Amino acid sequence: MTRRYWNIHLEEMMEAGVHFGHGTRKWNPRMAPYISAKRKGIHIINLTRTARFLSEACDLVFDAATRGKQFLIVGTKNKAADSVARAATRTRCHYVNKKWLGGMLTNWSTTETRLHKFRDLRTEQKTGGLNRLPKRDAAMFKRQLSHLQTYLGGIKYMTGLPDIVIIVDQQEEYRALQECITLGIPTICLIDTNCDPDLADISIPANDDAIASIRLILNKLVFAISEGRSSSIRNS
């Protein structure tokens, strides 16, 4: 894997609050190598390590994007949801930002059935088919469509399992991470000081509670994905 320069600056990360971890009582001892200090009862993340692993993750997704690989970004908590949707939409990645439905990946056949139903209902709505149904039936299908849009809207174009999954909060998205581990899907995780750095293929130590921190990390990753896709087009 070729190493590239991704314009990752410590000052920029400090401004975004990437270095602020959790309280010192709420930590995972395995995060010790990624912590540089304690300040006012809070662990401070070593941003040099963050920059190293973020750069490594950018190299990985760039190379994967040049080969046409598919990405899924997962971040369902309120502080992450908007940033996840924007970053994914900008680079045509799949995303889950509302709720992780159990078995979304490990029980892919069920997810695929739901996606087919979702596409059929969207087609019916666009062609006016729902309006030709009795009111009660139309209302029921519209409720189904709304529910599917909420939970599957970000993966509506997904036709198979993703090649790489980017996870914003390891603890919040633990079920998603476990499904990836079960299936052998490579993962990139933002990990705060209360996480286990050994669970993901690449763990990026960072504040996973601040919107600015989440946005900065995601923006670097999706920029690398976008660059990889552009490189693939130029070289084809």
From Swiss-Prot:
The keyword Ribosomal protein applies. Keywords: Chloroplast, Plastid, Ribonucleoprotein, Ribosomal protein. Pfam families: Ribosomal_S2. PROSITE patterns: RIBOSOMAL_S2_1, RIBOSOMAL_S2_2. The keyword Oxidoreductase does not apply. It is found in: Plastid, Chloroplast. One of its GO terms (cellular component) is small ribosomal subunit. Coiled coil: none annotated. One of its GO terms (biological process) is translation. GO terms for molecular function: structural constituent of ribosome. Transmembrane segments: none annotated. Belongs to the universal ribosomal protein uS2 family. HAMAP family: Ribosomal_uS2_B. PANTHER family: 30S RIBOSOMAL PROTEIN S2 PROKARYOTIC AND ORGANELLAR, SMALL RIBOSOMAL SUBUNIT PROTEIN US2M. This is Small ribosomal subunit protein uS2c. The gene is rps2.
